[in-house]
Regions:
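Membrane-proximal basic amphipathic "stem/tether" segments
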Residues: 1-56, 61
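A short, glycine/small-residue-rich beta-strand->loop->alpha-helix junction that serves as a flexible
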Residues: 35, 39, 47, 59-72, ...
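Extended catalytic core of nucleotide-activated donor transferases of GT-like folds
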Residues: 43-44, 58, 69-79, 85-181
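Conserved catalytic-core segment of nucleotide-activated headgroup transferases in glycan assembly
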Residues: 70, 199-203, 208-261, 267-277
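Short beta-strand->alpha-helix junction loop in the catalytic core
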Residues: 91-92, 165-167, 187-205
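Short acidic alpha-helix that forms the nucleotide-activated donor recognition element
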Residues: 273-286, 296, 315
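Nucleotide-sugar-dependent
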Residues: 289-311, 315, 323-331
Length: 362
């Protein structure tokens, strides 16, 4: 919000006599104005009046992220004979995560954050055979909150929820969902039922580019990926005299300092919408998850959560270049991936560059 909007907000609520009530209204109006989207308001009204057909399941994503899992869930349900409606935050919808479906295959609706708290009161929910929440946490609240409890959806008996972080099961009180088999996870963990969606359209096998293309996708933060590993690997490859390759970097954030002699090999695309990201994935030959075995923060990707990189590798059938520590959890081995340990990422990238088209196709 701008300073002028903040001042106007305070003036509008000054007439409310009770401090707690005044604070509550200021918070609501601030959230409403900062997230306001006219199309989303219209879409939400249309959804509430929507004549839901039989055997329809609602997929609901309350956040601005995790759009990569929605197409796979939609594909699974459509293949099982269900109809699918999707309700998502308007900022995610603008990124077009469902661009791989034909118009009419799925009904798509959008909403603002301020619509979520009253969601459970919507009568249209009773018409769905089931409701699938693709992220159980609501990230718009500091420290995150349980979207199910916040909205009252946890009281629905036909609810399924996807938990992206096992540590949140006790924090959000999801033990009963887990016991009833209604809590889903994207990986094979001791808790939750594994369902790994990774559909991004019909993607035929493609031959390797004459000059191999590597790609990494995701937020440029040390907590998620170690991009210093990539710089070191590029140094290794260049020192061996190879120049016939490129690396596409997709994601928001700061990459850090890149030596000038390495920049010609990098294409920093920044954050892309889903159609552009899908196109970049199609052009690539190898995927770089950039998980660091020496970073304790990356242990969560084999203990309590998964990396979204795996969904992209599975769905686009790209060869991952990944450290052995993380490989087996995702089903990667010497037959379907390029693994490294002592030889480092640079050594594995050299093996990729030296592969023939026949070896790649195997």
């Amino acid at each position: 919000m701008t300073h002028t909007q903040t001042v106007m907000l305070r003036l509008l609520t000054m007439c409310i006599p009770f401090r707690n009530l005044r604070k509550k209204w200021r918070t609501f109006l601030r959230d409403f104005l900062s997230d306001y989207d006219r199309d989303a308001r219209r879409s939400m009204r249309a959804w509430r009046r929507h004549p839901v057909a039989g055997r329809t399941i609602l997929i609901l994503e309350p956040n601005y992220c995790h759009g990569e899992v929605i197409p796979g869930f939609c594909r699974h349900l459509l293949d099982m004979g269900y109809r699918v409606d999707v309700l998502m935050h308007h900022s995610l919808a603008r990124q077009s995560p469902l661009c791989c479906f034909k118009e009419g295959d799925i009904h798509i609706f959008t909403a603002m954050c301020t619509s979520w708290k009253r969601l459970a009161k919507a009568r249209v929910l009773t018409r769905y055979e089931a409701i699938l929440i693709s992220t159980s946490a609501f990230y718009d609240i500091p420290g995150w909150a349980s979207f199910l409890h916040m909205t009252g959806l946890d009281k629905f008996a036909n609810l399924l929820a996807v938990e992206h972080e096992l540590k949140d099961i006790p924090r959000f009180g999801e033990e009963e969902l887990d016991r009833q088999g209604r809590l889903l996870t994207l990986g094979s963990f001791p808790r939750g039922m594994m369902v790994n969606p990774h559909f991004f359209g019909e993607i035929p096998p493609a031959p390797r580019n004459r000059e191999p293309v590597f790609i990494t996708v995701g937020s440029l933060s040390a907590q998620r990926k170690n991009h210093e590993l990539l710089v070191e690997a590029l140094e290794t490859v260049c020192n061996e005299g190879y120049r016939n390759f490129s690396v596409i970097i997709v994601g928001e954030g700061e990459l850090g300092k890149i030596p000038g002699h390495l920049r010609p090999f990098l294409h920093v695309a920044g954050k892309l919408d889903f159609p552009a990201m899908y196109e970049a994935m199609r052009r690539a030959d190898y995927f770089l998850p950039l998980l660091d075995p020496g970073n304790p923060a990356h242990n969560r990707y084999i203990t309590t959560g998964v990396t979204g990189s795996a969904q992209l590798v599975y769905g686009f059938a790209k060869i991952p270049v990944i450290h052995e520590k993380f490989a087996s959890f995702y089903g990667f081995n010497d037959r379907n991936a390029l693994l490294y340990r002592e030889e480092t990422l640079g050594g594995a990238m050299l093996r990729a560059i030296r592969q023939t088209e026949e070896e790649y196709a195997e």
